[in-house]
């Protein structure tokens, strides 16, 4: 999960 909105929300 590095190109997903969920991952982006974590960072």
UniProtKB/Swiss-Prot annotation:
It is an enzyme of class 1 (oxidoreductase). The keyword Oxidoreductase applies. It catalyses: 6-(2-amino-2-carboxyethyl)-7,8-dioxo-1,2,3,4,7,8-hexahydroquinoline-2,4-dicarboxylate + 3 O2 = pyrroloquinoline quinone + 2 H2O2 + 2 H2O + H(+). One of its GO terms (molecular function) is pyrroloquinoline-quinone synthase activity. Keywords: Oxidoreductase, PQQ biosynthesis. Ring cyclization and eight-electron oxidation of 3a-(2-amino-2-carboxyethyl)-4,5-dioxo-4,5,6,7,8,9-hexahydroquinoline-7,9-dicarboxylic-acid to PQQ. This is Pyrroloquinoline-quinone synthase. It comes from Pseudomonas protegens (strain DSM 19095 / LMG 27888 / CFBP 6595 / CHA0).
